[in-house]
Amino acid sequence: MILAVIGINHETASVETREQLAFSSKQVKELVQKLIEGQPIKEASVLSTCNRTEVHFTVNTGQIEAGKNHIMTYLSDFSDLDPREYVDHLYFITDQEAVSHIFKVTAGLNSLVTGETEILGQVKKAYQLSDEAGGVDSIFHGLYQQALRTGKRVHRETGINDNAASVSYASVELATKIFGSLQNRRALIIGAGKMSELAARHLYSNGVKDVIVINRTIERAKNLADKFGGLYASYDQLSEWLNEIDIVITSTGAPHFVIKEEQIKRAMKSRKYSPMFLIDIAVPRDVEPSVNNQDNAYLYTIDDLEAVVESNMQERQEEARNAELIISEEVAEFMVWYKTRDVVPLISALREKAEDVRKMELEKYHKKLKNLSPKEQEAVDKLTKSIVNKILKEPVLRIKEFAVEDKSELYMATLAQLFDLEDEVIPKDGEEHSSSKEVESVTQSSTERGHHESDFHN
């Protein structure tokens, strides 16, 4: 079984390309359902944010090319893009490198703004949507549980998000660089999601005079505005507010432009061409790019935030190195679990066989032991269990070590023959054998630090 990642991000593709491969929650679920229909994809999850679209998947060994082609077919179907338009922007990684990548993404190390916290919620949502679509089984439950724990641990144990901790923060920082000060400035926020809330928080902390929230759902606009004592309005009032504000920060999930050039043209005339700065952090973009053609209208996209991010990068380098160490440790732990999954049935069968022999031998001596007191019989039972466990301890450890070193198949077959366990399921290339219950048992034993709580439901 191969665990892999295929995708694009802000480092490999421009916003123009990324927005065409950005998917709504509904599309994510539909895409996952299509990906897992039939062969060769076993498990699949889709992470789609403003900075990346990735498909995480498992596929039988030997079918990796078929899996990639399967994914690209559906990416094209859902985006109406010819694969030739984006294939050069794709990255493809497998197994430990893929796990490390997912953990780094979740911790915010691969984000436009290193250490941003929004990605944790986005990964959690991708996990939930993909699970609801039927794309998540034992491997991905283990993967995302540990990825989310790792992300939280990185933020808890390092100061990586002490500076520009989000795209929203960077957008407000850009506005501050433009104006010098936000005192007496009026800002319009379009959208009422998490990024919009963070933007509002940062605007107020930088002394902005007023924040007006516009959202498709007026109730959500009101709820967000009420948190900060701001104003709210409906989309019908957008053109009216464009006549009065200095800064627009927009982050909706709309599949079309929310602000068009013609609107800005009319607004600039009405406001006698006083400067307006628009910061579009949505993917797909909310603002028609030709807005930049209007005098004194200055449009910035999410890709333009890179310069702002770079200014704080030096301060975060040391914390990023500390985060890398944490991630390396967590990846190593996950890989032990991942590689030992297939030996769980054999280990269980070996223990059951030994337990059957122990009970059978005790039964033979039942008459001789019946004169013992209950306490003495309990002591004999514990003694025989202890002997069995001690005999099995080293073989079980060796089986797991061989699995981690990718040497398990021959040794497992030999062990099965030696102990007459051939009827037990021995993993063959590309087969999945560990039950969810068995895998969970191994997961719990490999996470003895007490952090096996469910991040999915928290």
Swiss-Prot record:
Keyword annotations: NADP, Oxidoreductase, Porphyrin biosynthesis
Positions annotated as active site in the UniProt record: C50 (nucleophile)
Residue ranges with Basic and acidic residues bias: 426-440, 448-458
Name listed for the protein in its UniProt record: Glutamyl-tRNA reductase
Family statement: Belongs to the glutamyl-tRNA reductase family.
Residues reported to bind NADP(+): G191, A192, G193, K194, M195, S196
Gene name tied to this protein: hemA
Claim: Glycosyltransferase is one of the keywords in the record: no
